Amino acid sequence: MLKMSVTPMMEQYLKIKEKYKDAILFFRLGDFYEMFYEDAEIAAKELEIALTGRDAGTEERAPMAGVPYHAADFYIDKLVKKGYKVAICEQLEDPSKAKGLVKRDVVRIYTPGTIINPESMDEKSNNYLVSVYREKDNYGICAVDVTTGELYATEIKNCKNGKRIYDEIAKYSPSEIISNEEFLKNNKYIKVFKNNNCAVNAYKPLNYEASSELIEKQFDKKVEELELEDKKFVIHSLGALLSYLKELQKTSLKHINKLTLYQDNSYMGLDSNAIRNLEILESNRNKSKKGSLLGVLDRTVTPMGGRLLKKWLEEPLIDKDEIEKRLDAVEELFNNYRERIELKELLNKVYDLERLASKIVYQSVTPKDFISIKLSLQNLPKIKNILSKFSSRLLKEIYEKLDVLQDVYELIDKSIKDDPSNQLKEGNIIKDGYNEMVDKLRKASTEGKNWIANLEADEREKTGIKNLRIGYNKVFGYYIEVTKSNIPQVPDRYIRKQTLANAERYVTPELKEIEETILGAEEKLIELEYELFNEIREKVELQIVRIQNTAKYIAIIDVLISFAEVAETNKYVKPIVDYEDRIVIKEGRHPVVETISDEGFVANDIDIGPENPIMIITGPNMAGKSTYMRQVALIVLMAQVGCFVPASYARIGIVDKIFTRVGASDDIFAGQSTFMVEMSEVANILHSATSKSLIILDEVGRGTSTYDGMSIAQAVIEYIHEKIKAKTLFATHYHELTKLEGKLRGVRNFNVSVEEREDDIIFLHKIVPGGSDRSYGIQVSKLAGLPYSIIERAKEILEALERDKAVKNELEEAVSQFAFTQIDIFSSAKDALIEEIANCDPDNMTPLQALTYLYKLKEKAASLRSGVI
């Protein structure tokens, strides 16, 4: 920056700015945060505020832009959301008491993953900062929400599948990612995160020893106690995360006190494709909660409950006992309507305890925040009392562990006014009776104001000036104001202080004496209230872990009540869950479609198990194949989340992962062909699925030529059948694949029934056994509104193609048999030829018959070799 002579204040600014070159520096000057030079120019443009100048002791004025300190959060959030880092430089001493230049320094730095203002974010969404450490094909991944204190960590070793790492990070929808350089090199997924408004920055990790020391200090436990002794890559990732936060937050991180360590198989596996294709968190159409599974299930009334519900949907359980604990709790709440309603009404009065707790640690909590905490805690004894009536394991456990925080409630209740000022330096915070000195100073201040009122009345009477008034401002203090028309009546004892356009302001010795008494008391009172408030904050801060635990249990109750309420409203049933390799659903419905459909939803069954793990589903477009497959996946997911399901009966064999290849993809593979994207996704499924997985495949192979696509589709089915043995729903337009039912033991055909009426069709949306041999493409096109002339021309072309059915059938048979020759075990033509040779009886043939038979066999063998039967 500038090297020439500058003013002392500007010199101070430049020294601080030198340390934070990559941040926009908010420099506190009185009641404003000022920005200078390039920062000012950026701020003026991005915040749409005036760009002015300030004398800096140089020839040219320094460009300057500023925002009021009391509105700073709004402007900080705006800059951070645009990707800027913002450093807050505060005055570290009272300017009125400073000797010389006021001391200033940076007290906090904000980035997208470290903003702490709850008003700037969706209350039912987390704001995650993710730290990634990579060493060859080994990864340590940590995610933290600094506004709630939640911290998660996992380690993935020997992973060459970049998509798997992407999915693990993407499930947090991070606002910011920090990582070592090795992770950033040649990583095509980094662009995807950046395109989704996620800041991605390199951060040099600490060495192993320094990371371990930082972790142990943060959690006050040894690495072994945290079960990290064999988690080298997590230690590097977590060490970097904590180091980064301490650099930025410059305060204690007491609210980050629990590390949740998990493996990537701790929950049902849901990759980003499954979450998107099943529209679990948001609708693909409008990118909002409405139209998603979350939108249907979310009846939560607390911010904590809303956030927990999202997490549960992203991480369905795979432990039968844990699932049943949730289901039993939902059932008990479902059956006890009155208690459920009472609980919900009480929960509705609970504020965001998690984020309020974080504000206490960050010293950004306000007096009104404490009242929000008090009002929340006030309801806890009533909540606990209702919980005492329940007997299900989970609700009983919550009842036993729920801390009503009576001591915290009593402290706030006796110390903080019921309607306090929200500004710490304005007083009116501490309740009467809490502190003797506060009471004395407040009385002096109040009596002083009474003296002012009495003095005003006396002066009006003595002078005869009826509109005389006594006022106050911060510059001149107390004054007597007289309008110009009444100046002749002003007595000599009045001392002129200020001239206005229509009035004069005066003081008197008596007024100055009262002023000193009042202002002295008020100043001392404000300082004392501020000190006491900080003492109260520190006392409550010691109970942060207890507050967080209570918030966690409140969130669980909220989600369980939400599940019970939705189950009642939408007529869901309690599913049976077990470890059997079977899924049975009777009269299943799509949980989202049934709520938005104007027509009655057609329910469908499924019974899929070891003897029939693969369903090939045929039928026309728009008939409901995709809806059916998605509803099966969603019902399984809901059951494993611990929610009742839309069906008349459901028995769910727990699945370890759900995979989907449905419809268009997102921009992960931007620049690649549709077919390449499809094949990449299918390959990922085939590499990752197990016999306990549920696979949903829709129109695999459609992105290439008919024969290529059909061959690929069949090969995929064969591979799943022989190698993976996963439960699979496979929708296709390749009717030739229905012949696999007779070739592969575990394949069964189903189709979506339609009713034909002359040239029209009616979709019955019913899944029935058997394959379909027609696509009804022309009829569907007619329903879709294609012009009449095109429909008629399409009919003519179709009739021409169907005229020589013998040729058509021969071609189809040839293609089909060609496909079956690819794997010996499925070569029915070859098997038939071998069977024919084995069964022939040459002893009973004449020489001519034997020769004729031999030529016939030779012709069949030649046809087999050429691939045409």
Swiss-Prot record:
The keyword Protease does not apply. One of its GO terms (cellular component) is cytosol. Coiled coil: none annotated. Gene3D superfamilies: 1.10.1420.10, 6.10.140.430, DNA repair protein MutS, domain I (3.40.1170.10), MutS, connector domain (3.30.420.110), P-loop containing nucleotide triphosphate hydrolases (3.40.50.300). Keywords: ATP-binding, DNA damage, DNA repair, DNA-binding, Nucleotide-binding. ATP binds at G619, P620, N621, M622, A623, G624, K625, S626. InterPro entries: DNA_mismatch_repair_MutS, DNA_mismatch_repair_MutS-lik_N, DNA_mismatch_repair_MutS/MSH, DNA_mismatch_repair_MutS_C, DNA_mismatch_repair_MutS_clamp, DNA_mismatch_repair_MutS_core, DNA_mismatch_repair_MutS_N, DNA_mismatch_repair_MutS_sf. It comes from the Bacteria. One of its GO terms (molecular function) is mismatched DNA binding. The keyword Acyltransferase does not apply. PROSITE patterns: DNA_MISMATCH_REPAIR_2 (PS00486). One of its GO terms (biological process) is mismatch repair. CDD domains: ABC_MutS1. This protein is involved in the repair of mismatches in DNA. It is possible that it carries out the mismatch recognition step. This protein has a weak ATPase activity. Belongs to the DNA mismatch repair MutS family. PANTHER family: DNA MISMATCH REPAIR PROTEIN MSH1, MITOCHONDRIAL, DNA MISMATCH REPAIR PROTEIN MUTS FAMILY MEMBER. This is DNA mismatch repair protein MutS. It comes from Caldanaerobacter subterraneus subsp. tengcongensis (strain DSM 15242 / JCM 11007 / NBRC 100824 / MB4).
